[in-house]
Amino acid sequence: MSRPRNNPQTSSPQDSTKDGSSFHYFQGRFELSGKSRQYPADALEPQPGIGDVKVIEKATKSMLDPAQRSHFYLVTPSLVFLCFIFDGLHKALLSVGVSKRSNIVIGNENKETGTLYASKFEDVLPTFTALEMSSILRHCCDLIGIAAGSSDPICTNSLQVQRQFKAMMISIGRPLHSESADLLISYNAGPAIDWINSRPWVGGLMFTFLFGEFESPACELLDQVKVVASKAQMMTYYTVRMFLDQCVDGSTALPAVVLEIPVFEQKKPLAKKVLGDFFEFGGVLRHPVIGVLSPQMFPNLATAANYWAKRRNSTFSGFEALDIIPGSTITFPVLQMASAQKISRGSDMDPYTLNILRGYGISGFE
């Protein structure tokens, strides 16, 4: 005699998990309180400070000395140098929560002080040589990495910074200092770049730097910042734009890429409308609308564009982008095969792909 078959709607393992009933098996086996061991009170992250504005010259002169500099949290000297160069920055930093007091390095103890200058300057107002001034400007030029969003792309001794500093020294009439202003060459700007970039107010700071009016030499310094800031942190957007305009191989017609072309083309005018004339600086200003142009919004298109750019354009050879954007479904073998073929422009192309490429004028389709 045949037995009746179980009703799959009532006995399916998949269905029984919908209300969590199958997990009763695990409940009660490991009963934990949910609490966790906490960090001790003295394990707070060290913080930089900028001292009192009345003694910023004393603090700056003191921080030129490596021995004095070594007593303080790594970011403190960089902030002091910036406050020395840019009048009014000290007050602005205090207004966004930067402390006057800085952590100091004393063994493993976590202590702080508001006195950032050496005792020998207690009753002396220091003066600065031209070489000292240029060295401070050189360090501030290193801090251009703030615009790049990280200390990784721009290192103290990178050729990019050297070129920008040389251009700045020529513009202020001190070309010889482009080589000799090295008093701070061993002081790494990286910690300050990353610390400032982690602050919620970094977008406001960059807006002031980029669009404020400054006299020399701050003006010439910020001219170099603008060179880096223009299109910074938006490289993937410009890579995709170039890919769609110039690529003539089969990778633009990959189905996964074609599906995301309308997404990219529709998000672009939204960002431009919100940012207006500031669009090319949107990444540096950390405007939230730039998120609509994140490569995660069109991962297959961004992956194909990065692959194409790194192979076809030497400008992008050092572009540090992920080879495969998270969320992408296309693979390198697929890209390799597609890029080895010229894009079809005949009747063999499926209507949807043809309409997308024609509709958005991709790769010269009309």
UniProtKB/Swiss-Prot annotation:
InterPro entries the UniProt entry points to: P40_nucleoprot_BD-vir, P40_nucleoprot_sf_BD-vir, P40_nucleoprot_sub1_BD-vir, P40_nucleoprot_sub2_BD-vir
Superkingdom: Eukaryota
Biased composition (Polar residues): 1-15
Region (Disordered): 1-22
Tissues showing expression: Expression detected by RT-PCR in a few cell lines, including OL, HEK293T and MOLT-4. Not observed in HeLa cells.
Additional note from the record: Bornavirus is a non-retroviral RNA virus that does not generate DNA forms during viral replication. Therefore, integration of EBLN-1 must have occur through a mechanism relying on an endogenous reverse transcriptase activity.
Function, as annotated: May act as an RNA-binding protein. Highly homologous to the bornavirus nucleocapsid N protein that binds viral RNA and oligomerizes.
Protein name in the entry: Endogenous Bornavirus-like nucleoprotein 1
Source organism of the structure: Homo sapiens
